[in-house]
């Protein structure tokens, strides 16, 4: 890698660690078949990616967004709430338990009857 290329890039991306991440991501994109925005000039992918960043044919912001998207494992999708989902499916009212007016005494009596005790 040419030192001049790295020093040119530091003007565009001041943080060297971020520069390494962006250049590596762009080099992987090139390896995967992405089109080059500059002439290769017999350079390897990491050098080409640094030259693209230095010449601003690849925006650092666009590269940063693509890097973030490539590292995401779960993409958030807006899903309706359960109450809204029931209404959308034709239920009208969301599922709720029926009103229960059973007192403690009635509950104990029902349990005893179920067990066969008087």
From Swiss-Prot:
GO molecular function: DNA binding; DNA-directed RNA polymerase activity
Pfam families tied to this protein: RNA_pol_Rpb6
SMART domains per the UniProt record, alphabetical: RNA_pol_Rpb6 (SM01409)
Subunit relationships: The RNAP catalytic core consists of 2 alpha, 1 beta, 1 beta' and 1 omega subunit. When a sigma factor is associated with the core the holoenzyme is formed, which can initiate transcription.
UniProt similarity note: Belongs to the RNA polymerase subunit omega family.
Role summary: Promotes RNA polymerase assembly. Latches the N- and C-terminal regions of the beta' subunit thereby facilitating its interaction with the beta and alpha subunits.
Protein name (record): DNA-directed RNA polymerase subunit omega
Gene: rpoZ
């Amino acid at each position: 890698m040419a030192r001049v290329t790295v020093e040119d890039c530091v003007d565009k991306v001041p943080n060297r660690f971020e520069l390494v991440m962006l250049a590596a991501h762009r080099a992987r994109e090139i390896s995967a078949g992405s089109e080059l925005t500059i002439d290769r000039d017999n350079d390897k992918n990491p050098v080409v990616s640094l030259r693209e960043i230095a010449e601003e044919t690849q925006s650092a912001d666009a590269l940063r967004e693509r890097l973030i998207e490539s590292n995401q494992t779960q993409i958030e999708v807006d899903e309706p709430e359960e109450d809204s989902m029931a209404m959308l499916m034709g239920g009208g009212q969301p599922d709720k338990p029926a009103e229960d007016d059973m007192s403690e005494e009635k509950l104990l009596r029902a349990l005893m009857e179920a067990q066969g005790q008087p």
